[in-house]
């Protein structure tokens, strides 16, 4: 179903069954598959391909040569009906690729809202990208990666399968991330190692001075105290009882399967 207020360029191909919302814009030479749903006000600039069971929210801008919902690159994939979901107000720049999920990984690749995915960024099968994240040019997420809210991943950086990039993290460019990055941390290098707390980013987002001190103390317990990981976890949990900002660390530890970068 195509809303009567939507614009479809004469050279675009919108297959029967696709749902195009009000005031959406499908530019020249775009291809929209039969199981695709595109929300109100979303713009496909030109030469964009959206395939598979893909749902895109409202007011997104998707630039030329982006490919969304295509078959993933997992050799085990056998054509199962897996999905991509994208939220609202994202800017998805030229040649970005977002692949559908796998049955083994839950069947869903998900991108939240208000994100910026720069040129050539890749979001592999079963990844989850939160809200207000930035993936810079050529940033690459392998399968099953989680990127939490407000994280920034620098250009040419690769993230290993199943890694977690915590909330408010900044990963420097040309890095290789092979373990989980705790929230609020700056990481850099190959293999990526911690370089302190993302203080400037947290200040811009309105964190209080007291909260910043607590986050720094949690960071010091994890990386500067000489304690074992288990010992640091216990003391960080005690700190989190007094400072809600530190709870992000304890929640991260519960999710982490690859262990924090060291």
Swiss-Prot record:
Subcellular location: Cytoplasm
An example Gene Ontology CC term for this record: membrane
Enzyme class: transferase
Entry protein name: Acyl-[acyl-carrier-protein]--UDP-N-acetylglucosamine O-acyltransferase
Gene behind the chain: lpxA
UniProt keyword annotations, A-Z: Acyltransferase, Cytoplasm, Lipid A biosynthesis, Lipid biosynthesis, Lipid metabolism, Repeat, Transferase
HAMAP family linked to this entry: LpxA
Domain of life: Bacteria
Gene Ontology terms describing biological process: lipid A biosynthetic process
A molecular function GO annotation: acyl-[acyl-carrier-protein]-UDP-N-acetylglucosamine O-acyltransferase activity
């Amino acid at each position: 179903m195509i809303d009567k207020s939507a614009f479809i360029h004469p050279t675009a191909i919108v297959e029967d069954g696709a749902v195009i919302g009000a005031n959406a814009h499908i530019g020249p030479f775009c291809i929209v598959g039969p199981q695709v749903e595109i929300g109100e006000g979303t713009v496909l600039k030109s030469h964009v391909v959206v395939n598979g069971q893909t749902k895109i929210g409202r007011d997104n801008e998707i630039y030329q040569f982006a490919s969304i919902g295509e078959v993933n690159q997992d050799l085990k994939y056998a054509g199962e009906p897996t999905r991509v979901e994208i939220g609202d107000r994202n800017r998805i720049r030229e040649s970005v690729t977002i692949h559908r999920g796998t049955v083994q990984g839950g069947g869903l690749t998900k991108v939240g809202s208000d994100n910026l995915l720069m040129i050539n960024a890749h979001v592999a099968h079963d990844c989850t990208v939160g809200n207000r994240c930035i993936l810079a040019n050529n940033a690459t997420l392998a399968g099953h990666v989680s990127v939490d809210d407000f994280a920034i991943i620098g250009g040419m950086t690769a993230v290993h399968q199943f890694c977690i990039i915590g909330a408010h993290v900044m990963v420097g460019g040309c890095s290789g991330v092979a373990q989980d990055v705790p929230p609020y941390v700056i990481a850099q290098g190959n293999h990526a190692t911690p370089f302190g707390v993302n203080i400037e980013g947290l200040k811009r987002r309105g964190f209080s001075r007291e909260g910043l001190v607590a986050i720094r103390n949690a960071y010091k317990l994890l990386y500067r105290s000489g304690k074992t990981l288990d010992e640091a976890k216990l003391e960080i949990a005690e700190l989190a009882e007094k400072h809600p900002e530190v709870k992000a660390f304890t929640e991260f530890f519960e999710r982490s399967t690859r262990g924090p970068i060291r």
